[in-house]
Design a protein with these regions (language model features):
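SH3/SH3-like (including bacterial SH3b) beta-barrel domains
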Residues: 20-36
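An acidic-aromatic substrate-binding cleft motif
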Residues: 70-94, 100-102
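Short, solvent-exposed loop/turn elements at domain surfaces
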Residues: 18-21, 84-88, 97-98, 104-108, ...
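Active-site environment of divalent metal-dependent phosphoester hydrolases
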Residues: 84, 104-105, 144-150, 172-176, ...
Length: 550
């Protein structure tokens, strides 16, 4: 391979050790531990089949057949504190952010971890002011819950970032004003009253187009609602940004369609054509209260790259899972009703004194319910089955076991937060995820659990380092030196977000690794805990095989 200092290169091995010297040995020669897909720069020097490179901030040596020009798919689940946050880099080097956590939150005291991660990842603090802003192709706000969208507000305001499109589920909270007494009005917009046949409300004011969004923002220029404030920040600081409504009728997200190596199917939210007052609109059903409706209509993506399938599904709840399964299976019986009836029949069979005929009839009814539930699961699985899935609603317990069975993943990633009142991930949900997964040893990752084991040891070192830097700053004799140390402190805080809690997926469409940082690195060449998914040709699906050290 002819190397060029102006080209981008990427690790093509599962993992490799960056050497300090061009030698095979790693003992006392390890500079860093690199993963499949890590970006590197060639520094212009070779020594036999070794090349000097810079990767993950360190200079060192790698064999030239350990890297290539092929960029992989990278999916990072960020430890953003409370909420969800996913960072994707496509094989075409486009950046997609799906949710960003709660950022600074209601109090303004939150960690704003997605902001810090993006600042660290793209070195924004050191980016030349004369350079054009760094492009983020897509920001996706899966639904208007603070712990999913408010982390975007400071990113939207960042002068060194440019957001091209912002996608959403069409639900925009707005002030009620003087219309709050009318049942026809709702702070998610107007709702269509049910007809005798429908028996359900639909949201009439779903924001469907860019112009719809601009009109809503213009109608409420001074609203203090956090969602509107976040959207205004996007518009005011990114003049060319386009707001895009996402629903299942589009089939694919943006240009990631069947003509692209990376495909992103849109499975939700689901709209229905509703006629009201002589107009017909594609509307979202009112699933329950406002929270259930907002969460249940989360944007759902199914990513396909090569052989790998990844499901990303916002904050789906039991009511929405029933509705989704009805839509995709074509069977109107609810999963939740069947689950309840099966449980009740089983209890009756155990606890009641039944005649032979009564028992036979009850067992027959149980068999019929099980067969129908299995059919719904099978039909839904045809659409939703994935190899890796982001858990719905941070590992909350408001999920259907049967819907989890329809997803049937090998690995589940739970993005969970710090608020003890939520207690996410819930123990019963963890058990349900494992039980509904495929394989003998299904994998469950949690951004919080990945961090919690080091939160009492690592921070002591981290804060001591900050304290030492603060002392140096106080002792500095010039403002320039003080500013330099302050920037170093901010960069340290930014990089800390990526060190612990993040779960990363790397794949070329055939090989797949899922990795997280070790609690305590064993050496500079052993920093990552890595899990491999292997393609089984006979089964035509991925499987996990336990490796060394697991």
């Amino acid at each position: 391979m002819s190397l060029d200092t102006n080209k981008a290169y990427f690790i093509n091995q599962r993992d490799v050790v960056l050497r300090m010297q061009p030698l095979e040995k790693t003992s006392k020669n390890a500079a860093n531990h690199l993963l499949l897909g890590d970006y590197l720069r060639y520094l212009g020097t070779t020594d036999g089949d070794w090349a000097k490179v810079k990767c993950r901030g360190d200079e060192g040596w790698l064999k030239t057949d350990w890297f290539s020009e092929q960029r992989l798919l990278e999916i990072n689940f960020i430890d953003i504190g409370q909420g969800d946050g996913c960072h994707i880099v496509t094989p075409d080097d486009e950046v997609i952010l799906i949710d960003a956590g709660e950022g600074e939150g209601f109090t303004g005291q939150g960690g704003d971890n997605m902001y810090r991660f993006i600042t660290w990842r793209y070195n924004l603090r050191c980016r030349d002011d004369g350079k054009p802003p760094f492009d983020i192709e897509h920001a996706v706000m899966t639904h208007p819950d603070l712990d999913h969208y408010y982390g975007f507000i400071n990113l939207f305001k960042h002068p060194k970032l440019n957001f091209k499109t912002i996608s959403h589920n069409g639900i925009v909270e707005r002030p009620l004003g003087g219309a709050s007494q009318s049942s026809f009005l709702y702070d998610l917009g107007r709702k269509v009253p049910p007809t005798p046949r429908q028996k359900v409300y639909h949201l009439w004011d779903t924001v469907r187009t860019h112009q719809d969004m601009i009109e809503v923002l213009d109608a409420h220029p001074n609203s203090q609602k956090f969602y509107l404030s976040t959207l205004r920040a996007a518009r005011d600081n990114n003049p060319q940004v386009q707001f895009k409504f996402v629903d299942q009728s589009q089939k694919f997200f943006a240009a990631y369609n069947q003509n692209n190596d990376l495909q992103m199917e849109v499975l939700g939210p689901i709209t229905e054509d509703i006629e009201f007052n002589g107009q017909t609109k594609d509307c979202l059903i009112k699933l329950g209260n406002e929270g259930e409706t907002k969460n249940g209509h989360s944007v759902i993506f199914k990513l396909r790259y090569g052989k790998l399938k990844v499901l990303l599904g916002g904050d789906l709840n039991a009511k929405s899972q029933d509705y989704i399964a009805q839509y995709y299976s074509g069977i109107q019986t609810k999963m939740s009703d069947l689950e309840d009836e099966i449980r009740d029949i089983r209890e009756d069979l155990i606890s009641q004194n039944l005649t032979i005929d009564e028992r036979k009839a009850m067992e027959q009814r149980l068999d019929e319910h099980r067969k129908l539930l299995d059919l719904i699961i099978s039909k839904t699985r045809g659409v939703f089955q994935a190899d890796i899935a982001k858990a719905c609603h941070h590992g909350a317990s408001d999920v259907l076991d049967s819907f989890l069975q329809a997803i049937n993943p090998i690995a589940t990633v739970i993005s969970s937060g710090d608020e003890e009142s939520h207690s996410h991930p819930r123990p019963d949900a963890l058990g349900a995820f494992g039980k509904a997964s495929r394989g003998h040893r299904p994998l469950i990752f949690s951004t919080e659990l990945a961090r919690s084991s080091v939160e009492f040891s690592y921070p002591i070192k981290f804060y001591q380092k900050l304290k030492d830097m603060e002392a140096k700053k106080d002792a500095a004799t010039t403002q320039a030196k003080k500013d330099e140390i302050q920037q170093d402190m901010e960069q340290l805080r930014d990089s800390n977000v990526a060190k612990y809690g993040m779960i990363t997926i790397r794949t070329d469409g055939e090989r797949v690794i899922i990795a997280q940082k070790l609690e305590e690195e064993r050496s500079p060449g052993q920093k990552w805990d890595i899990y491999d998914l292997f393609w089984n040709d006979k089964l035509q699906e991925y499987e996990y095989r336990k490796g060394k050290g697991h």
